[in-house]
């Protein structure tokens, strides 16, 4: 990704592992199918069949614990984003926050990346996360750009999508900080990446 301001959307009073396991993460991830199924299994630490690429036991949990200890200072979102590259929703869906938060943070940002599983949420800010080709075509018909994980190169729709330039399959030509394709509305093609 490169040097980026990372934003986390977290449950204030429930650690990310517990939020996943109990389903409380719906408040920050909406109806994303990658969340998995809540469980009461005492052996499990997270939801069953969770497919989200974000590892809750690493960065997300560390950030949540630091927040609980009061490590993070408060300040102006506009100042925090000014002249910087911002990753909207490193964890959590940006639709879970008031749009004014993102408007302030991104107002003077150099650029940003953003994705949402919530259909039609702020296409000026976020690319639409599509889990299937059918979902992608539905979003394209509404004029929305998508970000889609594909199982192989043969799944790429070359008329509507391009491979993520930072991906192994595209030769890791550029980091996100230089690419700047993954942000809301633009004339660029939608982005796809082979699952890893």
Question: What role is predicted for each listed range?
Answer:
Residues 1-196:
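Class I S-adenosyl-L-methionine
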């Amino acid at each position: 990704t490169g040097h980026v301001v990372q934003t986390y959307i977290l449950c204030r009073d429930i650690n990310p592992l517990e939020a996943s396991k109990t389903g409380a993460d719906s408040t920050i991830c909406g109806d994303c199918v990658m969340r998995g199924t809540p469980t009461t299994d005492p052996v499990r630490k997270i939801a069953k069949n969770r497919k989200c690429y974000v590892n809750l036991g690493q960065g997300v949990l560390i950030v949540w614990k630091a927040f609980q200890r009061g490590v993070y200072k408060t300040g102006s979102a506009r100042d925090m984003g000014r002249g910087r590259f911002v990753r909207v929703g490193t964890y959590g869906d940006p639709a879970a926050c008031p749009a004014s938060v993102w408007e302030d943070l991104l107002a003077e940002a150099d650029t940003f990346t953003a994705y949402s599983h919530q259909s039609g949420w702020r296409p000026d800010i976020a690319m639409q996360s599509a889990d299937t080709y059918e979902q992608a075509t539905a979003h394209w018909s509404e004029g929305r750009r998508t970000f889609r994980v594909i199982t192989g190169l043969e799944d790429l729709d070359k008329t509507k999508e391009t491979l993520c330039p930072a991906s192994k399959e595209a030769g890791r030509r550029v980091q996100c900080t230089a690419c700047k394709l993954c942000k809301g509305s633009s004339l660029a093609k939608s982005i796809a990446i082979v699952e890893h």
